[in-house]
């Protein structure tokens, strides 16, 4: 805890929710910085365009870093990850990685959806801007809370994301389909449509080649 410093945010800028997350952080950062004058937030992400770098402000401690050469190094040296994700679907990789690397975070309900089940979150979940700022500051300063949040993250990974939890069922399913491939294909209506149109495209391409060769 004592060897870590600064906040981070990370995400590929080709993905719109990541850009909107950074815009939200820019909006919230001033209130965080007022309470933590020595702290900075480092924004990482590949494909950062000029509009992203325009948000860079060293005086405010809002630092656009661009692509991270080593995600492991970034996650192991930061103190808190901030992810006020406004929209999106599915498991958020940045939050799962924050758990794996022992980095507590503050995120939105969208960010945390479908991730922790009945386990306590590794930090805080809130959609309220004032509360987001309060929790970010609290998590940054309170060592006991920070360590408890770190432990929560490890438990979530252990109980919900370990490979061993899914591997046997996945392998069994693959074997089952392989042994009953024809039956599976007959029940896979969408797959049949895709297969049909794949063959049709090949059919008409071959006809086009035949006509071209006649000339």
Regions found by a protein language model. Name each.
Residues 1-72, 76:
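Conserved catalytic-core segment of nucleotide-activated headgroup transferases in glycan assembly
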Residues 70, 87-90, 112:
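Active-site donor-sugar recognition loop in glycosyltransferases
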Residues 72, 92, 147:
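Glycine-rich phosphate-binding loop at the start of an alpha helix
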Residues 76-90, 103:
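Acidic donor-binding loop of glycosyltransferase active sites
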Residues 94-97, 104-108:
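Short hydrophobic beta-strand element within catalytic cores of glycosyltransferases
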Residues 109-120, 124-125:
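Short acidic/histidine- and often glycine-rich active-site loop of Leloir-type glycosyltransferases
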Residues 120-130, 138-143:
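Conserved acidic donor-binding segment of nucleotide-sugar-dependent glycosyltransferases
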Residues 145-147, 154-215:
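C-terminal amphipathic helix plus adjacent low-complexity
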């Amino acid at each position: 805890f004592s060897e870590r410093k600064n906040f981070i945010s990370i995400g590929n800028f080709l993905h719109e929710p990541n850009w909107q997350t950074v815009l939200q952080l820019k909006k919230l950062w001033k209130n965080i910085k007022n309470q933590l004058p020595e702290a900075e937030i480092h924004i990482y992400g590949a494909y950062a365009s000029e509009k992203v770098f325009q948000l860079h402000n060293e005086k405010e401690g809002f630092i656009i870093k661009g692509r991270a050469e080593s995600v492991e190094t970034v996650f192991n040296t930061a103190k808190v990850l901030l992810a006020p994700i406004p929209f999106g679907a599915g498991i958020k990789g940045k939050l799962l990685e924050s758990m794996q690397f022992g980095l507590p975070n503050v995120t939105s309900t969208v960010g945390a959806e479908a991730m922790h089940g009945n386990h306590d979150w590794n930090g805080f979940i809130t959609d309220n801007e004032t509360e987001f700022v309060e929790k970010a500051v609290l998590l940054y300063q309170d060592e006991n809370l920070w360590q408890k949040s770190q432990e929560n993250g490890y438990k979530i990974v252990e109980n919900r994301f370990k490979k061993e939890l899914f591997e046997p069922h996945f392998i069994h399913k693959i074997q089952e389909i392989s042994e009953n491939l024809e039956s599976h294909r007959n029940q896979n209506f969408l797959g049949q449509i895709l297969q049909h149109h794949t063959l049709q495209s090949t059919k008409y391409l071959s006809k086009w080649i035949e006509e071209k060769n006649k000339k």
